[in-house]
C-alpha cells in the first residue's frame, strides 16, 4: 500500500512539473491573480449571503408591508429623477400615521369603510375594545351577548370589523407575513356597560376578569378613542361626527377607577 501511495505521489509531481502552464512566462503573475480572484470570490459570497439574510428578514418584511400599503392606497410609488423609487403618503396614509395601535391598519380600514357609522358612543367603545383586549385565558373571543341583539348595530359593526381583519390576514399570508392578532370581542358587553355608566363591580359581576385587566384594557381603549378624536380632518364623509363621538366615548371610558389608575 505504501509503495503504491509513493508511486502516485511521484506521478502527480511529474504531471505537475510537466504541465503546460509551467512553460508560461507569466505563470507567477497568473497565480497571483488567481489567488486574488479566489479571495474576492469568497468575499463576494460572504457579502451576498449577508445581504440575502437581511433581505429575508427585516428588509423583506418592510418591502412586503409597503406592497400591502400601496395596494390598499396608503402609499404611492414615484420614480424620481435619479431613477429611484420614492414612496409618499396618500390621504389615507396620513390618517394611518396618526393612529398608534397594534391594529392600526384594521382600524383605519374600518373607519374608511364606515363600519362605525351607525354606533353611538357606548357602541363605539364596545366594538373598538376588541382591538385592544388581550384575554389571559383561552376563550372563543365572543361576548356573553351583543347589546342590542345579534341584528343590532353593535353586532353588525363587529361582524364587519371581523371581515376587515380577515381580509388583511389574507393579504399578510399572500405576502408571506405573519397573521395579525385577531380581534377579541370577549370584553365587548362589559365595556358597553362601563361606558353606559355602570359600576366596576356590576360590570365584572359573573365574569372571571380581574379589575386590573379591565382597567388596563379600558385605558388602552381610551387612548385609541382619543387618537381618533384628534386625528382630524378624517378623510371620509361623517368624519367630523365620528371624531366627536370618539371624544365622547373616550370620556365615558376614562372615568372613575380607570381615570385614577396609573396602570398602563
Regions found by a protein language model. Give the residues of each.
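Non-catalytic terminal extensions of ATP-dependent helicases
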Residues: 1-264
